[in-house]
Amino acid sequence: MRFIERYFYRPSPVQKGVALALLPLSLLYCTIATTRRALSLKREFPATLISIGNLVVGGTGKTPFLIALAKEYEDRVAVVSRGYKRGSKGLLVVSHEGKILEETPKSGDEAMLIAQKLPKATVIVSEDRAKGINKAIELGKDIIFLDDGFRFPYNKLNILLRPLLEPHFKLCIPSGAYRERPSLYQSADILAKEGKEYRREVNISNPTPRMLLVTAIASPSRLERFLPEVVGKIAYKDHAFFDIKTLQKAMKEHEASSLLVTEKDEVKLKESGLPLSVMRLEFFIDEEIRAHVREFVASRSPKLS
């Protein structure tokens, strides 16, 4: 577990002391976030908006959850994301109805993964989510999924994911891992708890005898329960791009026969020429959640026609 994960989830006595010392900053941050939410006016768009979000920093499975849910409506769907750590700015149409228009460095790893996993959908990245939504509507999409969209004051269905491992302190950053006050879980239209309303299963494609785990995801420790025996583990910052020569050197040092990577990391390494073993994720979402989403989509459709 990396330092920042230990600090938020399994802090040492020293880290607990640091968290308490930072409490005034945490309270200030939470107050600002709460005030901003209270003063925001809801905005309406002529489309069905469905947000997949969380309250904590780091990964809770938003992207695979979104992919699993959006598959049911794929022909009508656009996905709007910020495109974290991408090498471009502004609005970018990553894919349109299955045709991929950009490369991973410009789109970002998550947007490219969504584009590949939803081959009939349209994927848009934009720091300004409203511009992304309007572009999706312009392209004829009437169901729009927002990746990490909980904080935006739009008229939408809010799905919040609650992770299996929760932060030690129920405080906003920097004392805790929450981006907004934890009580906002109660404001979600759908609250999905990992292990109860959604779960994951992992299968490894192209396994080899000596796999070296290489990953650039927010919480690499969450992979532990799915891992086979590996010869080593290398964790980069979330969304980081890889240096091929560094990976080649690491493989040689560990006498590795392949790199074990997530699907999100695979999109950045497909053209590397390195042998890859990939952790293929299968996502299972409770049928009650799917039924709730169908009901919401059906209720919005007459208003949009």
Swiss-Prot record:
Domain of life: Bacteria
GO biological process, one term: lipopolysaccharide core region biosynthetic process
InterPro entries: LpxK, P-loop_NTPase
Catalysed conversion reaction: a lipid A disaccharide + ATP = a lipid IVA + ADP + H(+)
EC top class named in words: transferase
Similarity-based family: Belongs to the LpxK family.
Name of the protein: Tetraacyldisaccharide 4'-kinase
Lineage of source species: Bacteria, Pseudomonadati, Campylobacterota, Epsilonproteobacteria, Campylobacterales
Gene: lpxK
